Amino acid sequence: MLGGTAVVMTVDAYGPISDNAGGISEMSGLGPEVRAITDELDAVGNTTAAIGKGFAIGSATLTVIALFSAFNLEVNHTRIAAGLPEMSLQLTNPNVIVGLLLGSILPFLVGASTMLAVGRAAGAIVEEIGRQFREIPGLMELKADPDPKKIVDIATKSALQEMVFPGIIAVAAPPLVGYLLGPGALAGLLAGSLVVGATMALYMANAGGAWDNAKKFIEKGKLPGHAKGSAVHKAAVVGDMVGDPFKDTSGPGVAILIKVMSVVSLLVASLIALR
């Protein structure tokens, strides 16, 4: 679980650094030539971020496979010690099929909830910014300072509150499925979430970065006949708005989901093995 940490952190660090450099250059009033350079670095950062997330998702997938094997061994050991046959993972077992279906649903549920969470938090921040412009005298004329602490407070509280639902799913789903349907269904849940979650997380990481870079590609004038402000550029901006939470929130969130579910399943394996 920790073997790829150094590589992932090193590759992932490039993107935020280049992105922040662009924001600092814009807020500092530096010339467009500086912003052009930081945009190039930001585009590269999106690519390195996708690569880094690929390492992280691959590491999570291998971890889940190892934990699944440990879960299988623990359940069978407990059942044999109690004089029961080993757990059946045959696809003719209806509980396994139900577990597979439930496991394939959970990554979509968590991905959707995190996407909606980002939208709600962004809406609250935009509303607060509008309130400050309306209520702080001289802010529109740059004669007064805004209140950035309030913005950070909203973002932090939203991040914590909106992660309650995905966290409950990741922790509560394995013991519930195992208790109600037995260890075979829980094994199916893990297998379904692994296959769907790993591919979904990779798709989100790569697609989000591609949509973000597509907007930058158009803004640099590399798509003849479609300058900044055109219909194609507006569509690319929408793609960027979807791509950012895709690659930065939902993709990593799904990878974490399958890993947490596997750990929780291993912890409760001996408790639900006899059901």
Curated annotation (Swiss-Prot):
How, per the record, is this protein's activity regulated? Requires K(+) for maximal activity.
Which coarse location class describes where this protein primarily resides? membrane
Q: Is this entry keyworded Ion transport? A: yes
What's the protein's topology in the membrane?
Answer: Multi-pass membrane protein
Which cellular component, as a GO term, is one annotated location? plasma membrane
**In its keyword annotation, does this UniProt entry include Transport?**
yes
The source's domain of life comes to Bacteria
Bilayer-crossing residues are 51-71, 96-116, 163-182, 189-211, 254-274
* Reactions catalysed, as given in the entry: Na(+)(in) + diphosphate + H2O = Na(+)(out) + 2 phosphate + H(+)
Which cell locations does it reside in? Cell inner membrane
- So which cofactors does this thing need? Mg(2+)
- Which BP terms from GO are recorded? sodium ion transport
Q: Where is this site: Determinant of potassium dependence?
A: A49
The protein's Enzyme Commission number = 7.2.3.1
Q: What are the protein's UniProt keywords? A: Cell inner membrane, Cell membrane, Ion transport, Magnesium, Membrane, Potassium, Sodium, Sodium transport, Translocase, Transmembrane, Transmembrane helix, Transport
Q: Which GO terms describe its molecular function?
A: diphosphate hydrolysis-driven proton transmembrane transporter activity; inorganic diphosphate phosphatase activity
Q: Which PANTHER family match?
A: K(+)-INSENSITIVE PYROPHOSPHATE-ENERGIZED PROTON PUMP (PTHR31998)
On subunit structure and binding partners, the annotation says: Homodimer.
Regarding protein family, the annotation reads: Belongs to the H(+)-translocating pyrophosphatase (TC 3.A.10) family. K(+)-stimulated subfamily.
Function recorded in the entry: Sodium pump that utilizes the energy of pyrophosphate hydrolysis as the driving force for Na(+) movement across the membrane.
Q: What is this protein called?
A: Putative K(+)-stimulated pyrophosphate-energized sodium pump
Q: Which organism is it from?
A: Myxococcus xanthus
List the top taxonomic levels of the source: Bacteria, Pseudomonadati, Myxococcota, Myxococcia, Myxococcales
Gene responsible for this protein: hppA
